[in-house]
């Protein structure tokens, strides 16, 4: 036996039935779609329809709630401000505001839509006395800034 003499067993490989290719093909004319109606036309699928059984969307209970007035915060940490001060992107003499943080690329805040909250994760000491004007602060961040001689405007 050689490679060029190999072949499939009879019936092992079956050609698929080509539908809607003439009446003589056995699957012609309507091509298995029935007669007339929305589902016989091309490009139509009834979204969420499961053949008459109660759809999944109706079987599952309603759950949850999206509060419209939820405040979305851009979260920064004290060490982010320390890095910007070390790089020279921020000045310790100025009032640090949301706009200055955007300019210094500490916060990515398109059109100033989000609020900015300062946290103190990974920071246990803070040396520079800064004056900050942000939207929110964690309790630990407030303590660290005030201990360093800074102000929250």
Curated annotation (Swiss-Prot):
GO terms for molecular function: rRNA binding; structural constituent of ribosome. Belongs to the universal ribosomal protein uL15 family. SUPFAM superfamilies: Ribosomal proteins L15p and L18e. Keywords: Ribonucleoprotein, Ribosomal protein, RNA-binding, rRNA-binding. Signal peptide: none annotated. The gene is rplO. This is Large ribosomal subunit protein uL15. Residues 23-35 have a biased composition (Gly residues). Pfam families: Ribosomal_L27A. One of its GO terms (cellular component) is large ribosomal subunit. The keyword Manganese does not apply. One of its GO terms (biological process) is translation. It comes from Rickettsia rickettsii (strain Sheila Smith). Part of the 50S ribosomal subunit. Binds to the 23S rRNA. Residues 21-41 are annotated as: Disordered.
């Amino acid at each position: 036996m050689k490679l060029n003499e190999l072949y499939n067993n009879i019936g092992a490989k079956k050609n698929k039935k080509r539908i809607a290719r003439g009446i003589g093909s056995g699957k012609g004319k309507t091509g298995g779609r029935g007669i007339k109606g929305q589902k016989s036309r091309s490009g139509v699928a009834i979204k969420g329809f499961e053949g008459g059984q109660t759809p999944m969307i109706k079987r599952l209970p309603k759950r949850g709630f999206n509060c419209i007035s939820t405040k979305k915060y851009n979260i920064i940490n004290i060490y982010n401000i320390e890095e910007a001060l070390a790089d020279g992107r921020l000045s310790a003499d100025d009032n640090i505001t949301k706009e200055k943080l955007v300019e210094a690329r500490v916060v990515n805040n398109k059109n100033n839509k989000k609020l900015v909250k300062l946290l103190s994760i990974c920071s246990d000491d803070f040396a520079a006395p800064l004056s900050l004007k942000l939207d929110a602060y964690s309790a630990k961040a407030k303590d660290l800034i005030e201990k360093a001689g800074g102000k929250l405007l």
